[in-house]
Amino acid sequence: MNTLKAQRRETTEKAKKLRREGYVTGNLFGRQIEGSILLKIEKKEAERIMRECMKGSQIMLEVEGKEYDVLIKEMDYDAMTRSILEMDFQELVKGEKVHSVAEIILHNKDKVIEGALEQLLEEVAYKATPEHLVDKIDVDCSTLHLGDTITVGDLAIAKNKDVDVVTHLDSVVVTVLTPNNADIPSDEDAEETAAE
């Protein structure tokens, strides 16, 4: 399991100032934590963990020597630079279900040769205990043809008895559509070309 190191942040330390100094701010909360713990994380450390993890990933958070089994609950990015600004973590309790999301990753998109592949859903919301958390869902697009659709109900996560899927099972994840109508000459266009 990936480990992220963080430090406690004093309430007097302003987020903007910390970000200028190379930190990402954060919060740790959970049923067994009174209030929440304000955090500061070295930006390089946050970027390292984000290369391997995502929203919904389970990691070990080390705060000044104490380790917490946590879920990456939220991440805020700078709209212009897309650099990470803030991360929120929820402490996990063994045997207790937690709300989370699993990111949908499409594979073999280039194998879809007829039609245009359109992804309509980026993540699936679900509830599970810490030992059954899912941070990503891999979807193979290599066998999709024009008119094919994959719904949440078709995904492995929907068939996992240890996971309660919250997103509607009939929600469309990906579909293969007819290519843009502008690229296909209509009968009227053909008639106009012939008349010229």
Name every feature range the model reports, one short phrase each.
Residues M1-E196:
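Acidic, negatively charged sequence tracts
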